[in-house]
């Protein structure tokens, strides 16, 4: 494509591959609503800037998102949910994984959620929690379990928050634990 600087030209090679110069930005929309940047100067990152990304398929059990690490060391791939705001605070939600489908009336329903929150944002005393939510009875998303870091070193609690000793709560080997903690 035409440009006033040859070093900024987008080219196609003999294989039909389209080549963008290093550290340039691909913009989508008249207001650059989405941008894609290949940042060669750091970790060879591909940076997408915009709001939402959808990967769609009408094929059974698709789409599948695969992170493939072929390194022979002991470390694997990572999914990182990074909330990088200017004023982190206690009780901020760091990230969610939502499991959404429809009910028999075609109403969109969140059937499960894994949520991480900040318990204590104090530098040197950071604590977090991971909460597990599931839809119960009328589709209400209810916290069933919380794993929470405490202010003492190496201490973590696991709370089955809906345990009532009769209908809901902790099961061991499929049997509901009927006793409640004092």
Range-by-range predicted roles:
Residues 38:
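Short beta-strand
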Residues 105, 119-122:
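Extended, low-complexity, turn-rich repeat/linker tracts enriched in Gly/Pro/Ser/Thr and Asp/Glu
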Residues 5-28, 33-35, 43-102, 109-116, ...:
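Short Gly/Ser/Thr-biased coil->beta-strand turn/linker motifs
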Residues 1-3:
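Beta-strand-rich solenoid/repeat architectures in extracellular/passenger domains
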């Amino acid at each position: 494509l035409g440009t006033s600087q040859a070093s900024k030209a987008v080219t196609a090679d003999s294989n039909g591959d389209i080549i963008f110069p290093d550290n340039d930005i691909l913009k989508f929309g008249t207001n650059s609503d989405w941008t894609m940047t290949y940042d060669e100067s750091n970790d060879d990152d591909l940076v997408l800037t915009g709001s939402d990304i959808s990967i769609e398929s009408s094929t059974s059990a698709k789409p599948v998102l695969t992170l493939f690490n072929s390194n022979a060391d002991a470390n694997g791939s990572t999914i990182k949910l990074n909330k990088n705001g200017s004023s982190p605070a206690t009780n901020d939600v760091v990230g969610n994984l939502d499991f959404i489908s429809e009910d028999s009336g075609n109403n969109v329903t969140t059937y499960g959620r894994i949520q991480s929150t900040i318990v204590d944002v104090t530098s040197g005393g950071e604590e977090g929690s991971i909460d597990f939510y599931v839809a119960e009875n009328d589709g209400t998303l209810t916290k069933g379990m919380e794993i929470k870091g405490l202010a003492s070193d190496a201490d973590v609690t696991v709370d089955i928050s809906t345990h009532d000793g009769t209908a809901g709560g902790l099961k061991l080997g499929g049997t509901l634990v009927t006793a409640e903690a004092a």
